[in-house]
Regions:
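Glycine-rich adenosine-cofactor-binding loop
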Residues: 1-8
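Conserved S-adenosyl-L-methionine
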Residues: 8-15, 112-116
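NAD(P)-binding Rossmann-fold cofactor-contacting core
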Residues: 12-40
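Generic secondary-structure signature for well-ordered alpha-helical cores
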Residues: 34, 38-41, 64, 71, ...
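Short, basic, helix/turn surface patches
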Residues: 41-51, 142-151
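Rossmann-like adenosine-cofactor binding region
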Residues: 42-117
Length: 151
């Protein structure tokens, strides 16, 4: 939900969130959608994960897709949140917070469809920067870590 919240604060006009209605995440997403509508000018719309018509419609009008689930991460690298790769279009940037594997099925299929893609490695790096500082009180040598980690 942090990604949605920050996107709304940064000026996103509309955010489609797909979740399972039986998950505890659903209630948090519904509460955030309500809160965001009062705090920002962003319209946050909550959809059931299995609503393929809503997914198709949302992707057609979107320029950014972010997978903020663990779907596609080791050990289940065959999983994807977009089972129909014809839904990708070159104007859609696709980001996946998954960092292992570096290119998930979602990112591979999006790239093959001409979409710009980003994996979760930079998010992981910057979470590490913050954790390093909390635990040690020191600044992590980001350039050294980036050089070794991003080879």
């Amino acid at each position: 939900m942090a990604i949605c919240g920050q996107s709304a604060l940064e000026g996103a006009k509309k955010i489609h969130v797909f979740a399972r209605p039986t998950s505890r995440y659903w209630e948090r997403a519904a509460a955030m959608a309500e809160k965001m509508s009062h705090m920002t000018e962003c319209q946050m719309i909550l959809h059931e994960m299995d609503d393929h018509t809503a997914l198709k419609d949302a992707l057609e009008e979107s320029n950014l897709l972010i997978n903020a689930t663990s779907v596609g991460m080791v050990p289940d690298v065959t999983g994807t949140v977009i089972p129909d790769k014809t839904l990708f279009h070159p104007e859609l940037t696709v980001a996946d917070v998954v960092y292992e594997p570096r290119e998930t099925r979602l990112l591979r299929e999006a790239r093959e469809a001409g979409c710009p893609t980003f994996n979760g490695m930079y998010m992981l790096l910057h979470q590490g920067v913050k954790a390093f500082h909390i635990w040690t009180g020191l600044d992590m040598p980001v350039e050294i870590v980036r050089e070794k980690y991003f080879k």
